[in-house]
From Swiss-Prot:
The gene is lpxD. It comes from Ralstonia pickettii (strain 12J). GO terms for biological process: lipid A biosynthetic process. The keyword Acyltransferase applies. Transmembrane segments: none annotated. It is an enzyme of class 2 (transferase). This is UDP-3-O-acylglucosamine N-acyltransferase. Pathway: Bacterial outer membrane biogenesis; LPS lipid A biosynthesis. The lineage of its organism: Bacteria, Pseudomonadati, Pseudomonadota, Betaproteobacteria, Burkholderiales. Keywords: Acyltransferase, Lipid A biosynthesis, Lipid biosynthesis, Lipid metabolism, Repeat, Transferase. Catalyzes the N-acylation of UDP-3-O-acylglucosamine using 3-hydroxyacyl-ACP as the acyl donor. Is involved in the biosynthesis of lipid A, a phosphorylated glycolipid that anchors the lipopolysaccharide to the outer membrane of the cell. The active site is at residue 251.
Length: 357
């Protein structure tokens, strides 16, 4: 399980400075890599680690290599030069993982339940205790691990992987080459209840959720994330999105292509997130908002209004500090209204005095 440095460079569209025949057996961090390993430098803050690294070769940008050469640290080393070292590292890592991957054996486990009318190609691998209901359609080479559920009339595209205990509800769509980690639920009912209360009490009346959840191609969804089905129209996650663990996407949300959402974020119903957005962990969005393309939202931020200008970076988190300092600042914040009123009174007195003079 190894590659020559030249092979890796060719697969990346990169170039080699040094020994293209060097055999690379694995990847490792700069400060841990050995002579048969490949490391990467994607941040100039770690230039010193690159200098002292024992790696057989290092993925580096042209700019950082130029810096190392100017300092006299590049000679006699092996460099794989790529415009985006971090992305190059990711692609190399994929190649090594593919080499070591457990072979996929097509077939349906004897304990799986595949109802009549479901379409499961012979190239699929269906694990133990999987349930596939009537009308469900799987693409080629779909892999479904144990205890997962695919509801009636659901659709799953080619080469998609469902880890154990994933649930795809009836009528929902998952695209090609997707990865859904354990505990993901696609298409559960959205949180829709109409209040019907009077003087004598009443109840919350459930609104049937008759839309679908539609997931595009090349989407990865982390463990225990829920994407609810739409109330009437569909909930949509477009192609290329990457969603972390424990994210809640409510009914009728629309997430634009190639947006990334970190863990524990929550997006309320009917909010539309643009393309190429970056959503930090535990960020939360009110419902019925529109967020422009390429917007970045810091972790823990609460978004309560639409963002119409593309490309901004938004933060609402109060920075951490020692607890005693936080208590003092909180006390000041509580008194801001009173301070504002006093300031307005003082301003008025100054105006009155100026007029008298």
């Amino acid at each position: 399980m190894s590659f020559s440095l030249g092979e890796l460079a060719a697969s990346l569209g990169a170039t080699v400075q040094g020994d293209a025949g060097l055999i690379v057996k694995s990847i490792a961090p700069l400060d841990q890599a050995g002579a048969d390993q490949l490391a990467f430098l994607s941040n100039p803050l770690y230039l010193n680690q690159a200098v002292s690294s024992g790696a057989g070769a290092i993925i580096v940008s042209p700019r950082d290599l130029e810096t190392l050469e100017s300092q006299g640290h590049a000679a006699g080393r092996n460099w794989l030069i790529a415009a985006n070292p971090y992305a190059a590292f990711a692609r190399v890592a994929q190649r090594f993982v593919a080499l070591a991957a457990r072979p996929v054996v097509p077939g349906i486990h004897r304990t799986a339940s595949v109802e009549e009318g479901a379409r499961v190609p012979a190239s699929c691998s269906i694990g133990p205790n999987v349930t596939i209901e009537a009308g469900a359609v799987l693409g080629e080479r779909v892999r479904i691990a144990g205890n997962s559920f695919v509801g009636a009339d659901a659709r799953i595209g080619d080469d998609t992987l469902l880890y154990a205990n994933v649930s795809i509800y009836h009528g929902c769509v998952v695209g090609a080459r997707c990865v859904l980690h354990s505990g993901v639920v696609i298409g559960a009912d959205g949180f829709g209840f109409a209040p019907d209360f009077g003087p004598q009490g009443g109840e919350w009346v459930k609104i049937p959720q008759v839309g679908r959840a539609v997931i595009g191609d090349d989407v990865e969804i982390g463990a225990n994330t829920a994407i609810d089905r739409g109330a009437m129209a569909d909930t949509v996650v477009e192609q290329g999105c990457k969603i972390d663990n424990q994210v809640q996407i409510a009914h009728n949300v629309h997430v634009g292509a190639y947006t990334v959402i970190a863990g524990c974020a929550a997006i309320s119903g009917s909010t539309k997130i643009g393309r190429y957005c970056i959503i930090g962990g535990a960020a939360n969005f009110a419902g019925h908002l529109t967020i422009a393309d390429r917007v970045t939202v810091s972790g823990g931020t609460s978004i309560t209004k639409s963002i119409t200008k593309p490309g901004g970076h938004f933060t609402s988190v109060f920075p951490f500090m020692p607890h005693g300092d936080w208590e003092r600042n909180a006390a000041i914040v509580r008194g801001l209204t009173r301070m504002r009123e006093r300031l307005q009174q003082l301003e008025q007195r100054v105006k009155d005095l100026q007029q008298q003079s």
